[in-house]
Amino acid sequence: MRVRIIAVGKAKDRDLRSLLGDYYARIERYAKLEEIELKDGKADEVAERLARSIPDRSRVVALEVDGRAIGSRDFAKWLGRAENESVQTVVFLIGGAYGLPQELSKKADLRLSLSAMTLPHRLARLFLAEQIYRAFSILRGEPYDH
């Protein structure tokens, strides 16, 4: 399975890149990981760039402040179902300062909220990476999540 994280905006901060790199390396033990950073801009241009970055027959997760709040174990079950159903790519969409275009969010298989609080998109990317790693470790029965 492939995991593709598509984020509007760049994570330039060296410390953030280091933390992301650590979690991305951990995720790579379980799935091929790809991160795509898209330039922010006009809403219609962002929507088009995002849509072009989503492979056909992907399972799409839109990170939304008003999305569904689920725990780590339920998220692991969701990801496990995608694996069991031989989904080729699970795509995670992270919007910029103004969120995701509505038309893409509505088409997502899961609208996911990482927190009841609004997170900066760069921090949301780090939280997401940790939760993806945690989900895979739960699915494999590894001791990371206790």
Predicted regions and their residues:
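Post-transcriptional modification and biogenesis factors for structured RNAs
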Residues: 1-146
